[in-house]
Amino acid sequence: MDPVVVLVLGLCCLLLLSHWKQNSGRGKLPPGPTPFPIIGNILQIDAKDISKSLTKFSERYGPVFTVYLGMKPAVVLHGYQAVKEALVDLGEEFAGRGSFPMLDKVSKGLGIVFTNGKRWKEIRRFSLMTLRNFGMGKRSIEDRVQEEARCLVEELRKTNASPCDPTFILGCAPCNVICSIIFHNRFDYKDEEFLKLLEKFNENVRILSSPWLQVCNNFPALIDYLPGSHKTLLKNSDYVKNFIMEKVKEHQKFLDVNNPRDFIDCFLIKMEQENHLEFTLESLVTTVFDLFGAGTETTSTTLRYSLLLLLKHPEVADKVQEEIERVIGRHRSPCMQDRSRMPYTDAVIHEIQRFIDLVPNNLPHTVTRDIKFRNYFIPKGTDIMTSLTSVLHDEKAFPNPKVFDPGHFLDESGNFKKSDYFMPFSAGKRICVGEALARMELFLFLTSILQNFKLQSLVEPKDLDITAVLNGFVSVPPSFQLCFIPV
């Protein structure tokens, strides 16, 4: 048969299959924009700012609607009430991890982020317990973060108040905290192996937030056959996993079951004590990879965005420094006990996280069983997208949400004001494992920097662009330089 005829027949069959699948599912799922065959709603979604497109859809279809990413449907939850109802009130039913083909290819169903069912519960429980035993949210981890904050300050002094791009320096600090927990040692900020590791993570975040990755995720059949930045992401991930495996092998040589030094030792001991299918060397490497990915680049990007916003709003930086001077002074390091006496600084850090909206659409969830949600039937295994933008930028909770204003988290008396709408770490069963650590790092690193330096922009604040250059998976700030002027 003529190859052209075969191709045409194949395309026709694919179109018919796509049309049938979309029509058979749409009658049961929540309403949404009409999808095109094969490509779904891709052309109706801005790959550079997905959350903006979802907001437009919600204005027409309400807080619960369906979009087709390729041939696969995803139910979108938009607004605080819908997100809370699903992730918190029905936490067990919405606790599944949805499909993210590029990262699924990296994790291979292992680790803590992209696993499901019993394996996920076992690894998450073990990781939380181990991190807690090593002092996560307690004194010993605070000591490590304080030590790293002092190293960060010394590294910033070496810039001699000259213009610098803070990307890698700010990446070193949170990465070293994770290293101390997982490997029992930190790296020098000039260590070539360490800097290469950071470079791989930084590049992967940019790739993950690019429009091309949205295409790869929506059409996973293309991943193995087309060239593109997704290949770099896979190579970078392999490099990091090989680095971790070498560290694991070193730990195996000197393992003392009666004296575990770090996370890797604890995992290896667990492997020896229990013959769990969940606890294997491959699972250990992927779990450590997940902890690095979640605990390094997210905090580093938030710190970078923090400095950019403080340069844009020098009056806010001045007020924070006044509070630091009043509460902490110059002769001791900041500690977590200070936070309760520093409502303005606490409000600024919360507002930074709210404003930058780091992970606009959260990681995908999936329902673990057939469920009726707000009178709609959602079959088991359906992907769920939760718009964190719609919560963090809710106009009722945060008047003028597009404006950076620490007053969003202050009451009339200047006291810190909590908000149920503050969920940059997600919510429910899948809330970020490292939330306590991230909050500690943001407070101690930022207060340490502002205790020792005045931030000086190279351009007028009004000329600084604070718009995210990528807004797909993660909101990535534009590149910028500044001077750290010792005070």
UniProtKB/Swiss-Prot annotation:
Annotated membrane topology: Peripheral membrane protein
Tissue distribution of the protein: Expressed constitutively in liver, lung, testes, and kidney.
GO biological process: organic acid metabolic process; xenobiotic metabolic process
SUPFAM superfamilies attached to this UniProt entry: Cytochrome P450 (SSF48264)
Origin: domain of life: Eukaryota
Catalysed reactions listed for this entry: an organic molecule + reduced [NADPH--hemoprotein reductase] + O2 = an alcohol + oxidized [NADPH--hemoprotein reductase] + H2O + H(+)
Cofactor: heme
Binding residue positions for heme: C432
Family: Belongs to the cytochrome P450 family.
Physiological role: Cytochromes P450 are a group of heme-thiolate monooxygenases. In liver microsomes, this enzyme is involved in an NADPH-dependent electron transport pathway. It oxidizes a variety of structurally unrelated compounds, including steroids, fatty acids, and xenobiotics.
Name listed for the protein in its UniProt record: Cytochrome P450 2C16
